[in-house]
Amino acid sequence: MGRRRSHERRDLPPNLYIRNNGYYCYRDPRTGKEFGLGRDRRIAITEAIQANIELLSGNRRESLIDRIKGADAITLHAWLDRYETILSERGIRPKTLLDYASKIRAIRRKLPDKPLADISTKEVAAMLNTYVAEGKSASAKLIRSTLVDVFREAIAEGHVATNPVTATRTAKSEVRRSRLTANEYVAIYHAAEPLPIWLRLAMDLAVVTGQRVGDLCRMKWSDINDNHLHIEQSKTGAKLAIPLTLTIDALNISLADTLQQCREASSSETIIASKHHDPLSPKTVSKYFTKARNASGLSFDGNPPTFHELRSLSARLYRNQIGDKFAQRLLGHKSDSMAARYRDSRGREWDKIEIDK
């Protein structure tokens, strides 16, 4: 027969004890570990009863208070649906929306669909760390950036009070792709001679205009008027008017001469075209550039340069030849004043590139 409880202990719930100094402790019946509850008898009894209920139920049932608190709570996946609507209302370009959609799908896969306010920093950090462990630090950075915005919008609509993502570490990712020099460009250009002529024309057009491969493939002869090549960048929406007199001195490539060679090579609607006069895809251009690069015999530190590196080479050569501001304008990178002017014109005006040597 167990020892009878004293008067002070008689009305206490199981597992709650009072010390001689009037201090209450709760003993976990599973481990024997004790937890201090202070000297307030009413609070100690309430917390002990709640703990006993939780331990007895084995957490199989959601408590009443949790049900009350969660009645109007939005879950992560439901909020991501709302977030996609918010993105569509921002006027973001379709390509950028597709990029967002890819990251949102990853978030849905990796994080549990529970009340948004219950998503913890620990859960987010664990999810991001899985990408880092797989050597995908760049993906971790992009997904983290998206998640920061997801919760920022949730705060704006009153669903959560804090952002659990901002406390996580930003993954460090190294740019492993090698830069391309002018001499290496020439070596790859010569290695491309056995390949279709459109590859060398695309290379020259890329380096003299500084544009992305996707925009190169979309260039049409109808884009040329008033002695300028007009380009609307698919990624940024920047509208550039590049003078046909533009020449990149380090490689002795002029835009006018390159366009003339393109005209002689094909009668297609697009400036760069296959031997059958069909438009080329960015994937095809990049693949053939890789063939020429591999055939050149050049070796590189880190990952070898891709066709996209021609844009960086163009920027560096023009920076040395004309200046940094010119290079930035040619690439479509706007200064604050230019961005303001572009916003004011609602994108109707072309940024006419001027050569000021």
From Swiss-Prot:
Domain spans labelled Core-binding (CB): 74-155
EC number: 2.7.7.-, 3.1.-.-
Single GO molecular function: transferase activity
UniProt KW Hydrolase keyword: yes
InterPro entries xrefs: CB (IPR044068), DNA-bd_dom_sf (IPR016177), DNA_brk_join_enz (IPR011010), Integrase-like_cat_sf (IPR013762), Integrase_catalytic (IPR002104), Integrase_lambda-typ_DNA-bd_N (IPR015094), Integrase_recombinase_N (IPR010998), Integrase_SAM-like_N (IPR004107)
Database matches in PROSITE patterns: CB, TYR_RECOMBINASE
Keywords: DNA integration, DNA recombination, DNA-binding, Hydrolase, Transferase, Viral genome integration, Virus entry into host cell
Residues in Tyr recombinase domain copies: 175-355
Pfam families for the chain: Arm-DNA-bind_1, Phage_int_SAM_1, Phage_integrase
Family: Belongs to the 'phage' integrase family.
Protein purpose: Integrase is necessary for integration of the phage into the host genome by site-specific recombination. In conjunction with excisionase, integrase is also necessary for excision of the prophage from the host genome.
Record-given protein name: Integrase
Species of origin: Escherichia phage HK022
Lineage: Viruses, Duplodnaviria, Heunggongvirae, Uroviricota, Caudoviricetes
